[in-house]
Amino acid sequence: MAMNYNAKDEVDGGPPCPPGGTAKTRRPDNTAFKQQRLPAWQPILTAGTVLPTFFIIGLIFIPIGIGIFVTSNNIREIEIDYTGTDPSSPCNKCLSPNVTPCVCTINFTLEQSFEGNVFMYYGLSNFYQNHRRYVKSRDDGQLNGDPSALLNPSKECEPYRRNEDKPIAPCGAIANSMFNDTLELFQVGNASDLTPIPLKKKGIAWWTDKNVKFRNPPGTDPLEERFKGTTKPVNWVKPVYMLDSDEDNNGFINEDFIVWMRTAALPTFRKLYRLIERKNDLHPTLPAGRYYLNITYNYPVHSFDGRKRMILSTISWMGGKNPFLGIAYITIGSISFLLGVVLLVINHKYRNSSNTADITI
């Protein structure tokens, strides 16, 4: 049965109540919350409150920015591009697919000594690790040592889930594209003799990743037996249980592998490769002078117009070299201070005009 609509009924709270019934109404309860009568506080912006705020922000941000900028500039850093696209580059020969394995050497000079611990990174450009399908192409259960996931990886790993009718360990596009160049550093002596620089490969991964997120399959058997029934990723030269002779750095807990599996947010990124620890407080870790970078060139980047580089860097209390943060603080502080000055002049000018007008009237 149709019902007649009456706007007056809605305004009054509904149709008339039948005799003996209870009135129905849509009117909100008469409370402070539902009737929007809650007490409110609204600041009144005056010159006396706004101007000091601008000046305080400027006086705080500018010194902080200068301190961060100076600290960043004191960090020693050098980048060596070894992509090899330049015909004069020693690594240009490695772009040919017929030269395998390819070893090239780049010599460079440190103009200043590197003090303290030195961090060696590898850097890649135009590599989009943040692609949605790429980021999801992994099986965290398998990487955590789950035996069922080891033999039956997640479908997210497709098309790198199975190969030769065997499950791939580790599966997925991230693991399949793992960086596999080998970098070695040598110091050139006075008689042109080469002194190898010790590169530490443990301690480069996050503690939580090494001890919680990544684990080998459980058991007391040799690692090869625990990975029995699986096969290596398509692009790998050797299986995961042969990544290192050190049992504490082999399999899924290999730190080079763990570092690579932490995907980057931007297409140009760097990842920690090795540590160069300081052993003697009387001598710099890397003295100024000539060095050789020996590269076993395996990782192809030419197909996607990428670039490869090696970075040597020290760190400070704020991390690695990052001048942007200091510049940002200085810029914001300067703009705030300048706005304070401009508003102070405007306030002074028009306040005097207002007072004069009042007197004239």
Curated annotation (Swiss-Prot):
Q: Report what the Swiss-Prot or TrEMBL entry states about this protein's PTMs.
A: N-glycosylated; contributes to ATP8A2:TMEM30A flippase complex assembly but not to functional activity.
Which residues, renumbered to this chain, are glycosylated?
N180, N190, N294
Please give the positions of the paired cysteines in each disulfide bond: C91-C104, C94-C102, C157-C171
Q: Where is this region: Disordered?
A: 1-28
Q: Which residues form a coiled coil?
A: none
Q: How does it sit in the membrane?
A: Multi-pass membrane protein
List residues, modification N-acetylalanine.
A2
The written remark on domains in the entry is: The N-terminal domain seems to play a role in the reaction cycle of the catalytic subunit such as ATP8A2.
Q: What is this protein called?
A: Cell cycle control protein 50A
